[in-house]
């Protein structure tokens, strides 16, 4: 199990560094060619004013992420937060609404805007790549979800055949283990989708030279990280990960956006968000992230919980969960005005 935890650490760490390096390299290599003058920044930028918001955002966003992801994990201390309680179902519905709105209202529109920018003059981009990439990402997420669960189930069935047929309770144990594994796969894939988006939006804040834009992103990101942390923390709690795995996953979620902000600040002077290479790289990453988040929220979070026997047998819980879902999606959609 320790080896798996180490592999998990290196996996998420490598993904984070790779994404940061790709975006950074894209900006560095885009200065040799002609530049597109599609800048959205005000000509009279106050870099000093923007910098104070960036510096303040690093610890604030970090703390907001920690609070969000740890809240559902406190079930061991507070019984009302345990996965089997009604409060947990309602909280998870709210978080699923947040993640769904993140995919539809934040990430997908950004990807569409980037991949349909007038700065991209190539005829190849007349094809609707945004939806295509999001669709492929959703299909790949489905494949990872089903193949990982199927692989574990087959291997476990082979082992269980060696046990005497006279033993009872084996079927229920197998089913429980498969469900736990599937929840773990869901948590890891969901974190990957969130990390991709977090790196991109963190770099956007760090590279922003406008105080107004930096302030708006700063405020929006606080709630953004906290709300997304609720959804991820809920999946981690249901996956029954060991303490080290919980620490690793929670830490990577919390630090990814602050790392993106720091990288953005480092490349702010050379960053050209309207360069074709940067638009393509960030557009593709955002589209893929949107596909992952939309699939995970609808299939693995909402569908799983809303068809759960506990939910189906409790009309009051269903109503509360739907209200929480609409509230989470509504609040996150409102944040799209600023970020």
Swiss-Prot record:
Its main location: membrane. It is a multi-pass membrane protein. Residues 76-86, 145-184, 238-247, 300-315 are cytoplasmic. This is Zinc transporter 3. Coiled coil: none annotated. Keywords: Cell membrane, Ion transport, Membrane, Signal, Transmembrane, Transmembrane helix, Transport, Zinc, Zinc transport. Residues 26-54, 108-123, 206-216, 269-278, 337-339 are extracellular. It comes from the Eukaryota. Belongs to the ZIP transporter (TC 2.A.5) family. Pfam families: Zip. Mediates zinc uptake from the rhizosphere. May also transport other divalent cations. One of its GO terms (molecular function) is zinc ion transmembrane transporter activity. It is found in: Cell membrane.
């Amino acid at each position: 199990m320790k080896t798996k935890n180490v592999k998990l650490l290196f996996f998420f760490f490598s993904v984070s560094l790779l994404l940061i390096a790709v975006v950074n390299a894209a900006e560095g290599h885009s200065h040799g060619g002609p530049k597109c003058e599609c800048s959205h920044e005000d000509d009279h930028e106050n870099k000093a004013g923007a910098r104070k918001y960036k510096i303040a955002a690093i610890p604030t966003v970090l703390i907001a992420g920690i609070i969000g992801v740890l809240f559902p994990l406190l079930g061991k201390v507070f019984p009302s937060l345990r996965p089997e309680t009604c409060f947990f179902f309602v909280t998870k519905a709210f978080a699923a609404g947040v993640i769904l709105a993140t995919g539809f209202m934040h990430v997908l529109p950004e990807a569409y805007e980037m991949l349909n920018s007038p700065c991209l003059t190539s005829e190849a981009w007349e094809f609707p790549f945004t939806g295509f990439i999001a669709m492929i990402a959703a299909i790949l997420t489905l494949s990872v979800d089903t193949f990982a669960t199927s692989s574990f189930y087959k291997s476990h069935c082979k082992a269980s055949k060696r046990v005497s047929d006279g033993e009872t309770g084996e079927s229920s144990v197998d089913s429980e283990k498969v469900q736990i594994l599937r929840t773990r796969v869901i948590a890891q894939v969901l974190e990957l989708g969130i990390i991709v988006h977090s790196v991109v939006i963190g770099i956007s804040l760090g590279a922003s030279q406008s105080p107004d834009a930096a302030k708006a992103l700063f405020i929006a990101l606080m709630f953004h990280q906290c709300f997304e942390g609720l959804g991820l923390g809920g999946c981690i709690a249901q996956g029954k990960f060991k303490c080290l795995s919980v620490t690793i996953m929670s830490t990577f979620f919390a630090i990814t956006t602050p790392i993106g902000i720091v990288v953005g600040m480092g490349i702010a002077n050379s960053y050209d968000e309207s360069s074709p290479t940067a638009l393509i790289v960030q557009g593709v990453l955002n589209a893929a992230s949107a596909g992952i988040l939309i699939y995970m929220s609808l299939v693995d979070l909402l569908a799983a919980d809303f068809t759960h026997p506990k939910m189906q047998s409790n009309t009051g819980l269903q109503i509360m969960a739907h209200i929480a879902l609409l509230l989470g999606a509504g609040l996150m959609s409102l944040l799209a005005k600023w970020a």
